Amino acid sequence: MPHVEAITLTRDRRGPGLGAVRLWLYAVAALIIAMVVVGGATRLTESGLSITEWKPVTGALPPLSQADWQAEFDKYQAIPQYEILNKGMGLEAFKRIYWWEWGHRLLGRLIGFAFLLPFLWFAWRGVLRGRLLAKCLVLFLLGGLQGAVGWWMVASGLTARVSVSQYRLAIHLTLACIILSAIVAVARSLSPEPRQVVGGRLRATAWALVALVLVQIFAGGLVAGLDAGMAFNTWPLMDGHLIPPAAQLAAADPFWRNLFENALTVQFNHRMIAYALWTLTLLHALDARRAGGAVAQRAWVLFALVTAQASLGILTLIHQVPIDLALAHQFGATLVLVVATLHLGGLSGQVEPATPKLRLVKG
């Protein structure tokens, strides 16, 4: 009679439809990267305040007539940015900045549909269920929150300011990147590629790298919001100092305001975090040599990307933030984050519960 000879536990992530889910999530991640870059262009061209209202539905249509364009221009002329920075701007010049902001918002709507419609389809077909369904639902809700945060950011520049709050800009950028990392992590967890078991220290530093990249992205958002990259355009010295005088770093009172509002301190922090990230990535790659194989390869690829990103940041700084270098630097940040997330997923990503496989032998 047949009896059970052996039980083998496998981690099966090749269930029906999961490959399509993985491709869908990676496609949405690519759209988010495009959104971050377009958002950077919108900021660098000072286009972000050209649309002064938030209309999630009707705002999808651009002005269709001369009267519509004039109405939008009239609204822009009523805010401080026009009065202080762009007084005398003509309608054609306004159209150029309007299209950047409109395109940024349109891409946000596209991402929403690109996520929601396949999500509903996969859920209806039963491909998304259990923890995977819950994760995707959380991702969708985070996307909705990101849209609201975007308007919250824009609204900060429609009152007495001529630009958006650096606090809100940094939050908006960082939340986009958190969503990007989360989507990539979920997609990676569905890969049939096996994970390599490594020591706790290597896993811990992989987690730390993802966290530190996000901290650096937040710091970069503060630099962008304060236009801090337009000053102190030398490297490795800042205004002739490797470490600026304490009186300048702590010029504002109370001290914590310097961390967010003092352009010198904000740029200095961005530099110091970059050095820390580069050092940690190098140490992690050296540690990964003992694991060998794909783990070591990914760690060294990540180190190369961090090195390239730091070099690009230096070039952007010393050339006083030209738009092409600035956008490449922003794209590089998302690329580093994606690779760090994929690397972490290859070490300790979430997997589906083990499925027992029984082999029956006649006896």
Swiss-Prot record:
One Pfam family in the UniProt entry: COX15-CtaA
- GO cellular component terms, A-Z: plasma membrane
Q: Which family does it belong to?
A: Belongs to the COX15/CtaA family. Type 2 subfamily.
Q: Which organism is it from?
A: Xanthobacter autotrophicus (strain ATCC BAA-1158 / Py2)
Q: Where are the transmembrane segments?
A: 18-38, 107-127, 137-157, 167-187, 206-226, 264-286, 299-319, 325-345
Q: Which PANTHER family match?
A: CYTOCHROME C OXIDASE ASSEMBLY PROTEIN COX15 (PTHR23289), CYTOCHROME C OXIDASE ASSEMBLY PROTEIN COX15 HOMOLOG (PTHR23289:SF2)
Sequence positions that bind heme: H270, H329
Report the membrane topology from the UniProt record.
Answer: Multi-pass membrane protein
Q: Which Enzyme Commission number(s) are listed? A: 1.17.99.9
Any idea what job this protein has?
Catalyzes the conversion of heme O to heme A by two successive hydroxylations of the methyl group at C8. The first hydroxylation forms heme I, the second hydroxylation results in an unstable dihydroxymethyl group, which spontaneously dehydrates, resulting in the formyl group of heme A.
Broadest EC class assigned to this enzyme: oxidoreductase
Q: Which domain of life is it from?
A: Bacteria
Q: Which UniProt keywords apply?
A: Cell membrane, Heme biosynthesis, Iron, Membrane, Metal-binding, Oxidoreductase, Transmembrane, Transmembrane helix
Q: Where is it predominantly found?
A: membrane
Q: In which pathway does it act?
A: Porphyrin-containing compound metabolism; heme A biosynthesis; heme A from heme O: step 1/1
- Compartmental location: Cell membrane
Spell out the reaction equation it catalyses.
Fe(II)-heme o + 2 A + H2O = Fe(II)-heme a + 2 AH2
Biological processes, Gene Ontology terms: heme A biosynthetic process
Q: Name one GO molecular function term.
A: oxidoreductase activity, acting on NAD(P)H, heme protein as acceptor
Q: Which gene encodes it?
A: ctaA
Q: What is this protein called?
A: Heme A synthase
